[in-house]
Amino acid sequence: MSVKDIDIVIDGYPKEVLKFLEKNKIPIKNKFLNYGVFFLKFDEIDCNLTCLREDYGHDGRHSKVIFSKNLNADSKRRDLTINALYLNLEGQIIDFCNGYHDIMNSNLIFIGDYKKKCLEDYLRIVRYIRFCSIFKNPFIPKEYKIFFIENSNLLKKIPKNKLLDELKKIFVNKYFYNSIELIKFLNLENYLLNE
């Protein structure tokens, strides 16, 4: 499997990072300065460059941000433990949330309170379903399934283009059938597969 996209975090503030990118003539595909996010492209690899930050004031899709220099705080804003792994320039893994252990054991675990994480951003429910497609036998806690079923109406609030993007990503993964089976088990076909 070849890498098609890379996420990079940087301990700089958005205007500083923008200045650096422009000074070094690094092409920027898109940017969201309010969130400290820059989309770059190198050859065939998409690169998301994000300033370290903490999120607050969530409304189910968006949040307000405070830029930070704290990698640990940045990790806590992420959805799943497997998405909170960092690799420094020396090649050392930095893991504040037990993500490496969870990858090695096919565990899909939210960071902190799973209900709170999903209510902060409803798309996290769909992302969770998508991440089931990267593991042969993903471990999915029973309480997550119950919560997803009880809160399936939240999926109606997600823009269709965001749902479609996540669904497309499911089908490029080896174990896409895990996600499809979970969608059916959760009875979410009407919310997701008819889009």
Regions found by a protein language model. Give the residues of each.
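Catalytic cores of the polymerase beta-like nucleotidyltransferase superfamily
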Residues: 1-195
